[in-house]
Amino acid sequence: MHFGKCLVRSVFLFLESMDKHIENSAEYAGLTVNNGVQQPPMVNPYRTKKQKSPALSVDDYVTGILNKNMTILSQAVTLVESTRAEHQEKAQQVIERCLPFAGKSVRVGITGVPGAGKSTFIDALGMHLVDSGHRLAVLAIDPSSERSKGSILGDKTRMEELSVAKNAFIRPSPSAGSLGGVARKTRETIVLCEAAGFDTIFVETVGVGQSETAVHSMVDFFLLIQLSGTGDELQGIKRGIMEMADGIVINKADGNNIEKANLAKAQFRNALHLFPLPESKCLPKVLTCSAVEKNGIDEVWKMITDYVVFTKGNGFFHEKQQRQAKYWMYETIDEHLRNSFYHNEKIEQMLQEYEKLLLEDKISSFVAANRLLDTYFNKM
């Protein structure tokens, strides 16, 4: 008992001496240790929590877009891209209100092989338009990872001049695995941009693929960016994408590459003469340019405007837009039916059951699909 008391007292004295800094005693003459300073709190205690901004109404969105408010336009595009049901409902109301103010722009789809310099080309051509008094919206579609579904959204960083231009609006969006590398909501975003007063819309796609029909079905002019020495000009491969193109530009025609670019230009022209005449009755032109040195950029824009004037004159421009509207009506119906089917509670349960039966080879894919569809339509 006595030992315990002594131990407690010893510990107390030790702690007391530590608190009073034993170094200040006479034994340590000449050495002084001051008491420490209490550190301020890591978080400001007087800081008030930032209040969350109230959600915008449909009227707020429409008014902001028509008044060319870029912040509200960006928020409206985010609303359109959202997958939440309440956001989708509000987005559709905003789009319907904006439709009467849309349809007055020139829509240009830009595609090409990876590394062809699409973003740099858009930066150069876009600055040419902005300097000429146009208002330009660029919808840059970035590829999404098939594994993580993520996207870098780095296209805007490569458009150094255009990204800070006053009359330019750049919106990078993930492709999210949609058809042709074009985000599903790009069509609706175009409507919002047109209502905001943009007279020219660029849609940059992920790259050349078999299903680039999506971008072709929402633009007035389809531009293919190519490089010299890729072999396409010799073999005539990627015939489908070349048949869709309303114009071809050989980029990076600078330095030691000028001669190769001119050779590729001649070979592409020869290849195009073997194709049937397009529905527009306007034979696609092939030009060379250097986006870095900004050579040939004005000729590219003249090619686009000449095409628009020609097709408006023969009625193809209006006919094509009507055909596109019909195409997107069916696409929207398909998407809504697909979403309705897969979000049905009964179908979700049955899908798991039939997946198990398929893996056990107890049922065929076609029988399983028919039973699921029958159940879905009977419940309706």
Predicted segments, located by residue:
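Non-catalytic terminal/linker segments enriched in charged/polar, low-complexity residues
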Residues: G4-R9, F14-P100, E348, Q352-E353, ...
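Well-ordered beta-strand positions
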Residues: T200, F221, D246-G247, N270, ...
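Long, well-ordered amphipathic alpha-helical subdomains in the mid-to-C-terminal portions
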Residues: L73-Q75, T288, E299-F377
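Flexible active-site lid/hinge loop adjacent to a nucleotide/diphosphate
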Residues: V215, T230-E259
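Canonical P-loop GTPase G-domain recognition
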Residues: A253-V309
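Alpha-helical scaffold elements adjacent to nucleotide-binding pockets in ATP/GTP-utilizing enzyme cores
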Residues: I152, T189, A214, M218, ...
